[in-house]
Amino acid sequence: MTADSLRERLKSQNADYSLLNTSQASNRSAFEDKMSPVCKSRYVNDNQRLEQSRITMLETRIKWHIILLTGFSIDHLVLNSSFTSAILLFGFFPSYVNSSISLFVIIYSLIMIASYAFEIKFPNALKQLVYNKVQSKPPRPESSKSTPIVPDAQNVLDTSVQSNDLSWVDAHRFGTPSFKSSQLQQSPSPNKKSPSYSQVMSNVSVSDTSGILEDTKGGWKSPAVYGKSNESIHTRKQLDVLLRSNQDEIPVDMNTSTFSSIWSVFGLGRSGQISANNTWQVSEEITNDGNTNSSYRMKIGKNGRTEVKMLRRGKDGEIEEEDEDELVRLHKILNAAKLTPEGKTGILKRSNSIDRAGIRSRRRSHSSPERSTSTENEIRYQTGELLTEDQQKRAEFMTRAWIRNTILEPLAEHIDKVNKILDKEHANPPLRVGVSSVDALKLAAIERDSLKSSDLPFLLPFLSVHPNQKYLISRIKELCATQFMDAYKWNSGGSEPTDDNDQMTRLVRREWNDSLPTDAVLVFDIFLAYMDAQLNSNCLVGDSRLDQPFTSRFCVKNAQKPSSAQRTPFSFYLHMVTKSPPHAEFVHIDENGYAIKCNVLRQSPNLFRAIAQFIHFVKHENHGYLDQTSIGPSGINMTYVLA
């Protein structure tokens, strides 16, 4: 069955067409709204299965009590309680005691059969009756004056254009935790008291990670206290995209609608936590129609910084459009003066040496160590170094162990678990992760109720990183075979498993070729898919990448350019400069808007050292948080890679 036929089949069933997008941006299946048709049907099916199991259990109890009733009735009426006498110490008690006991068992069986039948016919009727009795209270006297219900001013913000109070704009900061600075210290999870990383690694060498293997696995299991928060600000268009799955079925208040994540796979435990404040808040977009008589105009420049310009008006009062700022216009005038022959213009010709000296002085203003303080850490930040060479070597091995224990090994285990479920389905044509295409698996996850409640919908973002499913699954299992991914090859990969045409039972392997991803690119894409699952969607990511909150904000690939948000001061991201040969960098923007690239060794250690630099910067310069998700033990648990 081809991909086109699968798409037509899905389209004919009025399903969400975005689930068949096989590009790397298609990770929506792991972030479905709990009110979407897919998740609603999943919950309905779960409730039906629970109800069916409850009825089956009650019917089994009724059958056993009927058998008990029949046996003791025959013993009491026909055998004169001889069977009861044999059970009770072989006739030790008198006959009237045996007769009373058999009669008691008969009455007990009748009562239990009646109660079970009533429970099947009217489930939870007695509990509801008792609950209503407890909750019933005498009516309160009506007050003489009715007071209108005023919503809490702390939860409702007036973001309209007519509002004069704009303090909420200054109070809100995108990408920072929504709590006080006194709470920035990372606290361990209330469910698990884990020792600090320094205590665990004090007596452990680089080659021995037995003390951290169990702790690093907590990244999939420990619920993040501030992770996957459901509170953010979105534009109206983005909110429509997020809630498009249930707009036609349930009336939704667009200003206070809920959107809860259901990322509960791999034992994250997030489904049990209910956020008290999980509302979306719609923000007003900036327009230039507010005051036409204003002499100033606010504009976001190419470097991402906000610029305020004075408007120039002509003789008739119309505004003269000038997209260039004063500095760009000055550079154009100077360049024109350089190209103009001497003696034909009144503009002085500026020498190249003066121009270059000015450029060098501007560069020294943000990167020269002479302006920094005497501390070694600040000097390293301004020269583009976050970790020393010894720290990078240790962090490289720790990052290898963290990725293997936290992402690759659980991923391989749950792929085998889903394959066992698919084998029991006996589908025609047969489905299997690693053999079937991603489109076929997505269609099966939508059509079959048994797969909706499985781990398959949450595996789809990881399976979408490359179309060759056989090589992808085989390479994941090969990489997670050892603690430090000894099979990792930065500029190549493993052999490709293929079926031999002559002998169908024989599995042969072809050497790695350019059509397959390198291990560096493969591990990087899987790392991005995992991080996308940990963060919430954000209003800065745009309308088409709401399902990639981490990739769209903290990653730049070779064919892309940094977005305006990534070029703003104090932002940071991972940059995959080239794919062949693969080379990654960590880049952070200083207070002047200049990009500082950290020195990362090339070849095999490159990817892991770049990720370690990223984690180090988040921990020390961003309070240990990515957006509202902690990277410490209470969240994603990434800080273990730092010694």
UniProtKB/Swiss-Prot annotation:
Record field: compositional bias (Low complexity): 179-199
Q: Taxonomically, which superkingdom?
A: Eukaryota
Q: What are the record's GO terms for cellular component?
A: membrane
InterPro entries in UniProt: Cytochrome_B561-rel
Residue ranges for the region (Disordered) are 179-200, 349-377
Question: PANTHER family, from UniProt?
Answer: TRANSMEMBRANE PROTEIN 209
Task: Quote the protein name from its UniProt record.
Answer: Uncharacterized protein B0464.6
Q: What is the protein's species of origin? A: Caenorhabditis elegans
